[in-house]
């Protein structure tokens, strides 16, 4: 008889790293073939700009999630409860209640952490007590070995599994753009301060002052940085001729944006893994990113791209400059990045790794 697994996770919308991984898990024939699975969506927001808003509506949605969980624990009787536990903000407490409910039923829990904030929670005695309860005798899946310090206070390494994310192959064929006089830099993520939007704009200002031939396109949904705020900053830095905001793009439009780029820039200030870096590598783009979260497990410094300290526009600009002036280096790093993606970060590689972990947990 197949073992039963209850997956409590995030599903799009909105589109972000955790919700996309949740969708990959739910849709995977490899992961679900050997188990009897049920799914509950943890999300209470339908778009990024809803996050932190409409509290009364979200209370109703959360009550529904709790009732769904209670019903599945009673009726489905899972052998394992998988929870994509949110570590950040107030969402931590709502997810923690779900996890403790499963523990109350005597269920074996495994937490898959897609974001970070456990270190900050060690400063609050209530959070420390809650974390001790949550993580006691519980297994954890992390995206990178660089993330273990986040939870080492609560979880021995013997109970930690490492499973890097993966992404599906490109769905459409694309034609690489013809060479132009300006090197095309792409930023693709939500417009958030935490994603380093302003850092990249400052770096672009430095590049412009050096009279380097480049153009930077920003693609992504509005968040704590609106289109108006973005354009105001662009004007302040006198970058109107060098920077363009192209809005949100999905599917073929997003792939076209990648195919038209020469360099991918992701100066994120707060990241767990960064699926978008994998997408850039899939398109044979050299990546300039930050020494943040599990990114050093993805980008090989000096081989598939460059990594700099976060919030350092000067250092970021210097690495971009190296790629702008050296087309041979761009192509070489891009090819190495594509090779690294194919060997380590395909969706199938993620599915196989995740399935191995599940089988270990439910055997």
Where do the protein language model's features map onto the residues?
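Short hydrophobic beta-strand element within catalytic cores of glycosyltransferases
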Residues: 286-289
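Conserved donor-binding/catalytic core segment of Leloir-type glycosyltransferases
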Residues: 6-8, 176-204, 216-222
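Glycosyltransferase donor-sugar binding loop
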Residues: 41-45, 188, 215-231, 247
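Nucleotide-activated donor-binding/catalytic signature segment of Leloir-type glycosyltransferases, i.e.
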Residues: 229-249
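Conserved acidic donor-binding segment of nucleotide-sugar-dependent glycosyltransferases
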Residues: 301-302, 306-313, 322-328
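Donor nucleotide-sugar binding/catalytic pocket of nucleotide-sugar-dependent glycosyltransferases
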Residues: 131-173
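A short, well-ordered alpha-helix in the C-terminal region of glycosyltransferases
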Residues: 315, 322, 329-344, 350
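Aromatic "clamp/platform" in nucleotide-sugar-dependent glycosyltransferases that forms part
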Residues: 269
